[in-house]
From Swiss-Prot:
The species this protein was found in: Xenopus laevis (African clawed frog)
Topology relative to the membrane: Multi-pass membrane protein
PANTHER family with a match to the protein in the record: ENDOPLASMIC RETICULUM-GOLGI INTERMEDIATE COMPARTMENT PROTEIN, ENDOPLASMIC RETICULUM-GOLGI INTERMEDIATE COMPARTMENT PROTEIN 3
Transmembrane segments: 26-46, 348-368
InterPro entries to which the protein is assigned, alphabetical: Erv (IPR045888), Erv_C (IPR012936), Erv_N (IPR039542)
Name listed for the protein in its UniProt record: Endoplasmic reticulum-Golgi intermediate compartment protein 3
Top-level taxonomic group: Eukaryota
Length: 389
């Protein structure tokens, strides 16, 4: 018994008799409010515990020989698909080789609605050719005229595109397609006239070599000339069909470099740029940071995040001495790699947080209750003393 008596001396929570306890309305209100606060903070702490914690790390990127996937969805409301070409080049200006792509062009009307039910697949570095005749009726070994634009290495023009390229190599303006047999049978003028008031949506993906480079959307047909990438803007063609200015207004619905991961923000998504003048050149300078995202279940996502700076200027589309009109995305790769690792939050931290919430709210509520109780008693005593005198 003496041991138990000594043990009672360490009780930090002495009890009072029920008869000496006073319950008040103020105390009840404080209890209810503090209970609600505890409940809200508890669920907040629980929600925080159930979310995954992401730890960032920084490494030197040692990967070699990888491919870079570029996801594209861009709308050009005032540039017909027949005039628009898409190309990818490396940092040296050479056209990218071994590029896997799945790009489509969707013709749009003035309200940005599809003109046709199906989009046309785009070939990099090539212009689309809508064949309206049966090619079996033509001699496969034929050599048709280039109408004075023949050269030693380009002596036969068996299609309208061949004639146009021969003219470009000579530096001649291609003004009268209706006088050229190849263009007449392929319906070149009808195709251009049909699309002159349309827009174009380009969507799909590119997989290029993981080196600095660019991809761009520009009017005209592209080709390699003396190892230099050339865009023939064909201002004379555009004027002849009513497009006397090149309007490169565009809306970037989506642009990313790789797969999405939780929390990723693509800074160009939803960007809408209006060309205030004709023949504008828009350049997006992109810095790509290789990124690895490791999920809790061990799944590893190898992707990229990027930052971007935009520059625009007016060009002379006819001469091209100030650049060419179009939208150019010039990207370079960071030598550093970011790694994000998902982890579950510690259960002991959760328990510590819950105890802190309960203890803190309980203590503060006790102080508030005591303040209310003793303040009320002091006021009541003053009132009673006033009545007595």
């Amino acid at each position: 018994m003496e041991t138990l008596h000594r043990l009672r001396q360490f009780d930090a929570y002495p009890k009072t008799l029920e008869d000496f306890r006073v319950k008040t309305c103020g105390g009840a209100v404080v209890t209810v409010i503090s209970g609600l606060i505890m409940l809200i903070l508890f669920f907040s702490e629980l929600q925080y515990y159930l979310t995954k914690e992401v730890y960032p790390e920084l490494f030197v990127d040692k990967s070699r020989g990888d491919k870079l996937k570029i996801n594209i969805d861009v709308i050009f409301p005032h540039m017909p698909c027949a005039y628009l070409s898409i190309d990818a080049m490396d940092v040296a200006g050479e056209q990218q080789l071994d590029v896997e792509h799945n790009l489509f062009k969707q013709r749009l009307d003035l309200d940005k609605k599809p003109v046709t039910s199906e989009a046309d697949r785009h070939e990099l570095g090539k212009s689309e050719e809508q064949v309206v005749f049966d090619p079996k009726t033509l001699d496969p070994n034929r050599c048709e005229s280039c109408y004075g634009a023949e050269t030693d290495d380009f002596s036969c023009c068996n299609s309208c595109d061949d004639v146009r390229e021969a003219y470009r190599r000579k530096g001649w303006a291609f003004k009268t397609p209706d006088s050229i047999e190849q263009c007449k049978r392929e319906g070149f003028s009808q195709k251009m006239q049909e699309q002159k008031n349309e827009g174009c949506q380009v969507y799909g993906f590119l997989e290029v070599n993981k080196v600095a480079g660019n991809f761009h959307f520009a009017p005209g047909k592209s080709f390699q000339q003396s190892h230099v990438h050339v865009h023939a803007v064909e201002i004379h063609d555009l004027q002849s069909f009513g497009l006397d200015n090149i309007n490169m207004t565009h809306e970037i619905k989506h642009l990313s470099f790789g797969k999405d991961y939780p929390g990723l923000v693509n800074p160009l998504d939803g960007t809408s740029i209006v060309a205030m003048q004709s023949s504008m050149m828009f350049q997006y300078f992109v810095k790509i940071v290789p990124t690895v995202y490791v999920k809790v279940d061990g799944e590893v996502l190898r992707t990229n995040q990027f930052s971007v700076t935009r520059h625009e200027k007016m060009t002379n589309g006819l001469i091209g001495d100030q650049g060419l009109p179009g939208v150019f995305v010039l990207y370079e790769l960071s030598p550093m790699m970011v790694k994000f690792t998902e982890k579950h939050r510690s259960f002991t931290h959760f328990l510590t947080g819950v105890c802190a919430i309960i203890g803190g709210v309980f203590t503060v509520a006790g102080l508030i209750d005591s303040l209310i109780y003793y303040s009320t008693r002091a006021i009541q005593k003053k009132i009673e003393l006033g009545k007595a005198t």
